[in-house]
């Protein structure tokens, strides 16, 4: 009986101490606010660290470097590239198209697509794409190639807004000219330009399958978003794409 009364007394004292502490906190708003802020910091500290689009931003930055390298070329190829750039309604830039050995097998890589607004002349935010399942008849060892595709027709732009399509089937494609004497009489929907080890090479991408990277688009823009929303409706944006867009915009000014 004595033990029971003792336990009751201890419980009553603990409860009273808690009530006294609560009263002190409520009487001092500053203490109360600090307590709430501290709890919030513990719960929500660094909420975006794990979801920062590091890979996606890296690809955007590499795409800018690739485009600037193509624009800065002082050989005949660069002159042809710059001369025909004004025809582009879209640009698909793949900084790292991987190939292996004597190309009789597959290759692939990821890239970003930007589309020009026909009314304003402004370029869109980048959307992420992947290209694969292509057979290339070119010996470049195990090196990677940089690729820039000029999308020249609205038909090709519309195909790129779908989930996937095949080059050469859904839209015609040809390799950009190499060396001097190249004529700007190409009539295909898309022209591809490739560079490996700093040298420009004619690479046929016919048969390649291009598909959207929905998860990368979501990671980069913070929500599920379609190519149409990114490229046409301009419903999302990222500060990380500013330098790439500015580099492309300068080329058309």
Question: Whereabouts are the PLM-identified features?
Answer:
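Short hydrophobic targeting helices and cationic amphipathic motifs
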Residues: 4-5
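Bacterial N-terminal signal peptides that target proteins for export
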Residues: 17-34
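Bacterial N-terminal signal peptides
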Residues: 33-43
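Sec/Tat signal peptide C-region and signal peptidase I cleavage site
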Residues: 44-50
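Small-residue-enriched, tightly packed secondary-structure blocks
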Residues: 51-253
């Amino acid at each position: 009986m004595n033990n029971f009364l003792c336990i009751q007394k201890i419980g009553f004292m603990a409860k009273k101490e808690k009530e006294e502490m609560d009263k002190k906190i409520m009487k001092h708003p500053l203490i109360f606010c600090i307590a709430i802020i501290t709890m919030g910091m513990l719960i929500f500290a660094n909420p975006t660290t794990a979801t920062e689009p590091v890979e996606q931003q890296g690809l955007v930055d590499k795409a800018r470097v690739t485009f600037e390298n193509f624009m800065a070329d002082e050989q005949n190829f660069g002159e042809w590239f710059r001369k025909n750039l004004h025809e582009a309604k879209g640009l698909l830039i793949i900084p790292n198209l991987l190939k292996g050995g004597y190309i009789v097998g597959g290759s692939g890589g990821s890239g970003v697509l930007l589309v020009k607004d026909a009314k304003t002349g402004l370029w869109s935010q980048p959307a992420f794409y992947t290209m694969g399942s292509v057979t290339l008849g070119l010996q470049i060892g195990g090196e990677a190639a940089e690729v820039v595709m000029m999308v020249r027709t609205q038909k090709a732009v519309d195909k790129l807004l779908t989930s996937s399509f095949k080059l050469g089937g859904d839209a015609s494609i040809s390799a950009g000219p190499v060396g001097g004497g190249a004529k700007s009489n190409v009539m295909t929907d898309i022209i591809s330009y490739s560079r490996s080890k700093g040298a420009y090479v004619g690479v046929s991408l016919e048969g390649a399958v291009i598909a959207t990277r929905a998860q990368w688009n979501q990671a980069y823009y913070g929500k599920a978003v379609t190519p149409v929303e990114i490229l046409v409706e301009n419903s999302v944006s990222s500060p990380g794409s500013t330098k790439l867009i500015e580099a492309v915009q300068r080329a058309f000014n």
